[in-house]
Amino acid sequence: MIKIKYSLIYIYFSFLLLIVSTSLFATPNGKDLLLACEHSLDKGFSGTKGMMCTWYVTPCDCFQSEDSEIPRVCLPPVPDVEALAREVTEGLAATPELFNKSADVAAGVILEKSFPCTDEL
């Protein structure tokens, strides 16, 4: 009886550890980005939501390989973060199929239309 009890406790804690470790390494998706950018546009680009929105709407065109799932985006030297956030927010609202993509892929798909990279790597 005691062995069964300890086995159940072990299984329970293993399951909890799996859930916690999965959520610790989860990356934001397009829906998360939409919510963060809507909040940022409404309340200002501060806090974690502001940082998240800014990070994903200003992608760096560095370390992009030809087989990368993340589209290449070439922004101007001094990008307007608010305008980029608005463009990504509108693009996500109009394209809900991007909600389940990672935030960097979703933002890249939207921004590559306005800011394509014309030169080779």
Stretch-by-stretch model annotation:
Residues M1, A26-T27:
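Absolute protein N-terminus
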Residues I2-Y12:
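Bacterial N-terminal signal peptides that target proteins for export
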Residues Y12-L16, E66:
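Domain-scale selection of a single, long terminal region
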Residues L17-I19, D119:
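Prokaryotic Sec-type signal peptides and long signal-anchor helices
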Residues S21-S23:
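N-terminal signal peptide c-region/cleavage motif recognized by signal peptidases
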Residues T27-T89, I110:
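Short N-proximal segments of mature Sec-exported proteins
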Residues T89-L121:
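Short, compact, well-ordered microdomains
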